[in-house]
Amino acid sequence: MYIKVKLMSNALEKINNFFKEKSWIKVFLIILMLMFVSFQLRAQTADMKFAQDNEFLKDMFSDEHGRMYLLALDPYYYLRLSENLYNNGHCGDTIKVVDGKETPYDLYQYAPPGHPLPWEPPVICLATLAIYYIWHSIDLTVTIMNAAFWVPAVLGMLLGIPIYFVVRRVTNSNIGGIAGAIALISAPGLLYKTCAGFADTPIFEVLPILFIVWFILESIHSQEKTALFKKDLKNPISLFVIAALIIELIIGAYLNIASGESVVIASILFYTVSLAFILAGLIIAGIKKLKGNELEFELFALLAVILTAVSPKMWGAWWYGFDVITAFLVIYIIALALLKSQVKIKEFINIGNLKNIVYLSIFYIFGSFVLLVAIYGMGIAISPITSPLGYNQILSTYTQTTGWPNVYTTVAELAKPSSWSEIFTNAIGSDTIAIVGILGILLSFLSLRYEKVKLDIKYSILLAIWLAVTLYAATKGIRFAALATPPLAIGLGIFVGQLERFLKMKSDIAIFGIGIPAGIFGLLILSKYSAKISQILLPTTYVPIIAYGFLIVLALLAIYKISDIISTLNDKKETIIKVSTLLLCIGVVIPPLSAVVPFSVAPTFNNGWKEGLDWIKANTPNNSVITCWWDNGHIYTYEARRMVTFDGGSQNSPRAYWVGRAFATSNENLSIGIIRMLATSGDEAFKKGSVLMNFTHNNVSKTVKILNEILPVDRSKAYDILTKKYGLSDKKAKLVLNATHPEHPNPDYLITYNRMTDIAPVWSMFGFWNFSLPPNTPNDKREKGAFFKGTAYYLGNGTILANVNVYTYSYVTLINSTNISTAIVQKINGQAKIIGTFKIHKLYIKTPLGVKELVLNKDGQLSEFIRIEADGRGYAWLATRNLEDSIYAKLHFLDGYGLKHIKLVKATIDPTDFGIQPGFKIYKVDYGTDYLK
């Protein structure tokens, strides 16, 4: 037994010595672990846990190979562009001549008329096709959608790397680096927008600045050694930097002046070369560090310059990161210059090489500016100066500027947060983590890297500026809260790292005041979350090589840590320190990880919708238009390849009023007039510069009033209204009528779906929009309608019972052959009690035998729709009175009852929301020819 223990002890000692001698292996394993953790968290969506093992639901939300569809809505826009790029060599649906030049053209978005696209493909499309080519070469069943699904998860593997190295640089603590990286990786807001399936651009809003900050801090750390600025042009680093800048300049300039199909090739070359230089720079830095050689600061500064030059292609607001770093460098230089003259405090503050810091700043700012000018032109290059001046207005989504309704006021992620707690929760998961992160930022001015207390102001300056800017943006719209995630995560990591550094001073105060409580904290967390440990370790096995690769890497790190602790058993203080810091790290990372395990999100696109959209694609003319509310527009254009009235990229337009009006009105002639106008001439009748807008001197209210008068009537009556009532000339009246009463209108298909019932307060508010009210009138002061959903039961003998939940009350209607009674029921102390009745103005009852329409009480403020299917299923809806005869209600609840020109042609399953089934409905709009009289 003794021999076995001795052998085990020797083996552990050898392992510990090995990791100490080859410390880079430990760092490599930590990086690998962080990459695997990030991927695993983001891959959970592929398991479709939302279905709860319901095979029907899994089949509905996946393709024929069982691979889940993309999440959200905007990813389908980029998916369509990616497929176009693969099939056509550009992102357009076709090529059109625009301003005398052949240009890729999007036929379907905001159509007619659609719009031109740049030749240069978005970076997300290139990333999608890169994964597709690799994966498809292995598995021929893989589609471009399948590849797009994994883009955010693959790129998300990079998120933790810069955080780990930044925190490690600040604190010299691997524990702190891991804690900070995990905090970022698991931040709920960021996780949702970068999980597998969310193939959108948020990943590109975060990644560039993370790496640029890391590169800048590494460059500052290497400030003592320079090559270029001491004119050592034969130095390999000097040659590499010069060559990289020249090549980037040439390729970037070529991309800027290229035209036509060569732009696609140039952009691929630009991204490839930029990535190659960044990877080469990191490899060079790694090799030099392994050899124990000092790095020249120009190397990491070059990487920061290259990535800054690429950033505008990833996100339109790229300049905020450049401004943060530039402000930091300027303030840091000023602070160092002031502190350098203070002889008494110089020994406590790390001043460093001020001259080289100035050189570094010039290199980064000027180098970035030159590349930006070459690649994009002067406009983009100076946008870090010009953009912030007008961005405050852009951030304020409630600003009304055109007289038309502002759709952004109804987009949840653009709403202003109600509290700091909401911002912090969206940014990093909880108020507690955010507060600790802020404390870490405050503590970052202390340098405890070498068990000595010194002041180092650079980290606190950078992080304070970064956090202040991002939190300010978050106060203008909750979607920007994710921008504050990186500085808060770094702050958390610094806090943990500083505690470890303080413990390593081995004072009794540190060990007993921090070490032992930290250990107890870790044990309590382990105990509290013990039931979820297995899920945290293995959240998914969808990609086995990653899942089990993570466990192997974690096991190797655990073996190292055990050997490290055992090697210190003879030194009780050292043992307490190592055990305490390990438990502290575990205690910090487990809560945020447990909060996102399991993690699942259901797609919107599904096979029920696919069936309906495929029907449109196969059975309608190519010039057909789909009229719908904007939210699902990208899905419709992707699957049906038909024009849509508006979508998630064009929602804030006058069409929001017109489409809302078409659904909310009870006037069928007005509704089809609106649809006919939008489907054929788009915005021609009401855009700025149109006949009516010029006639009314850009008075939107008057323009809308005129159009609402002429759209429901035939052409001759509309002509009389325009010429006799409003005094337009014959020529101008006919120009208006060409847009509103076209001779050759595009066919139109209306789509309704169950969620439209839920969001009726939104589209009806726009449909009932009162243009005479001040533009900044709050939404809650405007007229809107609503529907409340419930169930209905046929009890036999002509008796029907309907139950609709309205907030916390049940509105019950009992109908029999002789009487209709109502009751409002509330649960009080667990008992259902009738607390009153309600008055129904109009009642619609649809059965397999037909529709019965009854007016019950002229004073009723609610109306009710009841639908009983042949198989016994029953549905009920309460409606506000202003929507009781709306086109939407008659279409979705009654299948077009009472309408002459809009007919149901296809209905398929809608599994996305509770409601009528089949609930995805397609209607053909028949304009007829009478309107041309």
Swiss-Prot record:
Which parts of the sequence bind a glycophospholipid? Answer: R479
Give the residue ranges of motif DXD motif 1: 72-74
Instruction: Give any Pfam family that matches.
Output: STT3-PglB_core
Q: Which Gene3D superfamilies match?
A: 3.40.50.12610
Motif WWDYG motif: which residue numbers?
629-633
Instruction: List cofactor names only.
Output: Mn(2+); Mg(2+)
Q: Which domain of life is it from?
A: Archaea
Membrane-spanning intervals of the chain: 23-43, 147-167, 175-195, 197-217, 237-257, 264-284, 297-317, 319-339, 362-382, 428-448, 455-475, 480-500, 582-602
**Topology feature Extracellular, residues:** 44-146, 196, 258-263, 318, 383-427, 476-479, 603-933
**Which GO molecular function, any one, fits this protein according to its record?**
metal ion binding
| Pathway note | Cell surface structure biogenesis; S-layer biogenesis; Protein modification; protein glycosylation
Q: Which residues lie on this side of the membrane: Cytoplasmic?
A: 1-22, 168-174, 218-236, 285-296, 340-361, 449-454, 501-581
Q: Where is this region: Interacts with target acceptor peptide in protein substrate?
A: 629-631
Cite the InterPro entries for this sequence. Answer: Oligo_trans_STT3 (IPR003674), STT3-PglB_core (IPR048999), STT3_N (IPR048307)
- Which residues are noted in the entry as Mn(2+)-binding? D74, D200, E413
According to the UniProt entry, where does the motif TIXE motif sit in this chain?
410-413
Reaction(s) catalysed (UniProt annotation): an archaeal dolichyl phosphooligosaccharide + [protein]-L-asparagine = an archaeal dolichyl phosphate + a glycoprotein with the oligosaccharide chain attached by N-beta-D-glycosyl linkage to a protein L-asparagine
**EC id:** 2.4.99.21
Q: Which GO terms describe its cellular component?
A: plasma membrane
Q: Where is this site: Interacts with target acceptor peptide in protein substrate?
A: D74, E413, I759
UniProt keyword list: Cell membrane, Glycosyltransferase, Magnesium, Manganese, Membrane, Metal-binding, Transferase, Transmembrane, Transmembrane helix
**Which residues are marked as site: Important for catalytic activity?**
K193
| Topology relative to the membrane | Multi-pass membrane protein
- What family is this protein classified in? Belongs to the STT3 family.
Q: What does this protein do?
A: Oligosaccharyl transferase (OST) that catalyzes the initial transfer of a defined glycan (ManNAcGlc-2,3-diNAcAGlcNAc in Methanococci) from the lipid carrier dolichol-monophosphate to an asparagine residue within an Asn-X-Ser/Thr consensus motif in nascent polypeptide chains, the first step in protein N-glycosylation. Involved in the assembly of an N-linked disaccharide that decorates the S-layer glycoprotein and flagellins.
Name used for this protein in its record: Dolichyl-phosphooligosaccharide-protein glycotransferase
Q: What is the lineage of its organism?
A: Archaea, Methanobacteriati, Methanobacteriota, Methanomada group, Methanococci
State the gene name recorded for this protein: aglB
